[in-house]
Amino acid sequence: MSTLDQTVHFDFRDNNPKNVHETLETVYKALEEKGYNPINQIVGYLISGDPAYIPRYNDARNLIRKHERDEIIEELVRNYLGKEQA
């Protein structure tokens, strides 16, 4: 059987929520260092999808764009509620 005929298993958990956490920490620090209100800027980005809310400083914009917004929101809600990923 060729590899093209085999079903590949995708596990969302392979995206490692720790990476989302680390990304948010880095973005938060970059926003703080630039003098912005980090919470307002991150919320603005998550609601609008506009990367202009996140500075390029310390590669913060590129880092946050590596994650889907719904993935970031999922991690935030899970963390807020103290729930582990199933």
From Swiss-Prot:
InterPro entries in UniProt: IreB
HAMAP family reported in the protein's UniProt record: UPF0297
Protein name as annotated: UPF0297 protein LSEI_0786
Family: Belongs to the UPF0297 family.
Species annotation: Lacticaseibacillus paracasei (strain ATCC 334 / BCRC 17002 / CCUG 31169 / CIP 107868 / KCTC 3260 / NRRL B-441) (Lactobacillus paracasei)
